[in-house]
Design a protein with these regions (language model features):
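Phosphate- and other anionic-substrate recognition elements at nucleic-acid/protein interfaces
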Residues: 1-209
Length: 209
């Protein structure tokens, strides 16, 4: 578990959408430092990083940054990648957490009658981090996460393709040699009906005769 001095940490909550990022930042004592909206693009991300850096420079008692945002489809990926690796913020050891929306939804229940707006959502996410709810989560590792995500999805795609081709082969095999599927393992001529030997024999010989 990462040890962070919460008393000297700036907690940044971001409500992400396709077009904009609504940002709310406060310290452990709930003093507000940022409450603004930025475009969800590179210029907007650069501007946000500049404002966070200026805030850290202005308030010398702050030396660490925790950024929390909900994992919102693909919209949160770029801003999470940028803030976790931004050179301007590196002196302040930024920790970026992409949260399951269910976690913040459950936390919202502790606020009775809170209205549902983008700015209130950003505040809620910031407060979620302030009270230590991110301690059990792992910080964002964008490049590693995306590489693993693409690899696992490609593996699933290949597995589904193989399953589909095997199903197609079995249906054709039944039409050509229906009894092969009914034989016991000891009586089967091939140890693997999907193997190279089986494929070669069944391709070369057009019938049982």
């Amino acid at each position: 578990m990462i040890k962070i001095n919460y008393m000297s940490t700036l907690f940044v909550g971001i409500d992400v959408s396709s077009k904009s990022n609504v940002v709310y930042a406060m310290d452990f004592d709930e003093n507000k430092y940022i409450d603004s909206t930025f475009s969800n693009n590179q210029p907007g991300a650069d501007k946000l990083a500049e404002i966070i850096a200026e805030c850290m420079q202005k308030h010398s008692h702050l030396n660490t940054i925790i950024v929390a945002l909900e994992s919102t489809s693909v919209y949160s990926i770029h801003i999470a990648n940028f803030l976790s690796s931004c050179e301007l913020l590196m002196p302040y050891k930024p920790y970026v957490y992409c949260l399951n929306p269910k976690m913040t939804a459950n936390y919202r229940k502790s606020y009775v009658g809170m209205e549902k707006t983008d700015h209130m959502d950003a505040f809620l996410i910031s407060d979620f981090a302030r009270v230590g709810r991110t301690k059990k989560s792992e910080p964002w590792r964008g490049s590693q996460y995306l590489a693993l995500k693409r690899l696992t999805r490609h593996r699933l795609h290949l597995a589904e393709c193989i399953t589909r081709e095997k199903t197609y082969m079995v249906s054709n095999l039944y039409l050509k040699f229906s009894e092969l599927q009914l034989l016991d393992d000891d009586n089967r001529p091939f140890s693997n009906i999907y193997g190279a030997t089986s494929s070669a024999v069944l391709t070369e010989f057009m019938s049982l005769q």
